Amino acid sequence: MKTAITSLLVTGLLLGAAPAPATAQASGPDPDGPSLVVLVRHAERAGPSADDPGLTDTGAQRSRDLARLLGDAGITRIHSSDTRRTRETAFPLAGQEGLEIEIYDHRNLEAFAAALLAMPGRHLVVGHSNTTDEMSVLLGGASHGPIVEEWEYDRVYFLTPRPDGGMETVMLRFGPVPERP
């Protein structure tokens, strides 16, 4: 039931992100910008002791859940920081949709946000606990507060352009409920 409700919410959000008719006012969303940006933190990582850890089994399942959730979203580009855990989170959707994973510098979010706002299409951006919420704000969306580094892997942000040039932001949770320490 919860999955069905989430699917209905996402479908409604995506339908609301359809391109505006040609008669839209010039002050509306940039037609050369994104029609949808989806932001997620990487899935559960396999331990902080490794230099570049991959995903746990739970994280791998969450990445597959993400691909299932976004399978009908029409994602046209996938962006990931250059870490194994973010690439592994993006991989199921990239494989399913036949898309390349484009690497961005998560240490220079302002430049990436500016570039993203000039890219048409529907984007998935896979980041980190300290970048995902900040990226929402840099894109003109809302903050939903800091992500708890130790356990919070289930947030997904959907950003769609508003007529005033900002971004409408909806934050949902997906996949298995994370285990809190």
Task: Specify the residue positions occupied by each region the protein language model found.
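Short hydrophobic/aromatic segments of transmembrane alpha-helices and their interfaces
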Residues: T6-S7, P29
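Active-site-proximal alpha-helix that buttresses catalytic centers in soluble enzyme cores
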Residues: A26-L116, P120, T131-E149, D154-P181
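Bacterial N-terminal signal peptides
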Residues: S7-A17
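Positively charged n-region of N-terminal signal peptides that target proteins for export
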Residues: M1-A4
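Signal peptide processing junction and immediate N-terminal pro/mature segment
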Residues: A18-S27
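Conserved alpha/beta-hydrolase "nucleophile elbow" surrounding the catalytic nucleophile
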Residues: H128
